[in-house]
């Protein structure tokens, strides 16, 4: 029987990135089906008293999570998986900054419409992003980060540190 793994990620989180690469390797050698879902460190940390430097970094993540939410809404989870790989590869091993330009390049890598990149500077996809975030938070609470992983209905926050 196939094990269903649901994986919530913020595209900018290095811990989620490393864990996502691991679970995709697991999927190659085990009877596992991974479905990726968007979440947002920006939304998770809204209203919290954070160190100013950390707040600045968190605020910069919003364009990436909005882009992922847009892809999830417009194209579904399979395309989101490919977009996360494209964007994550640019950000994490690639060292590219989290910008609209990096989002646009990742969209192009996936053959997706460039117009999405222009829309991530608006709040157009925020309602969707908040709904995706709420699902993750309802599973594990608000005192966690990313990734959130649900395996056959049992959810956890996976911290690598």
What residue spans do the PLM features occupy?
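Local sequence-structure signature of Cys/Sec-based thiol-disulfide redox active-site neighborhoods
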Residues: 1-23
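Short strand-loop junctions, especially beta-strand C-caps/beta-turns
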Residues: 8-10, 90, 121
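Structural alpha/beta surface segment adjacent to cysteine/selenocysteine redox centers
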Residues: 17-103
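C-terminal cap of thioredoxin/glutaredoxin-like
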Residues: 22-26, 100-161
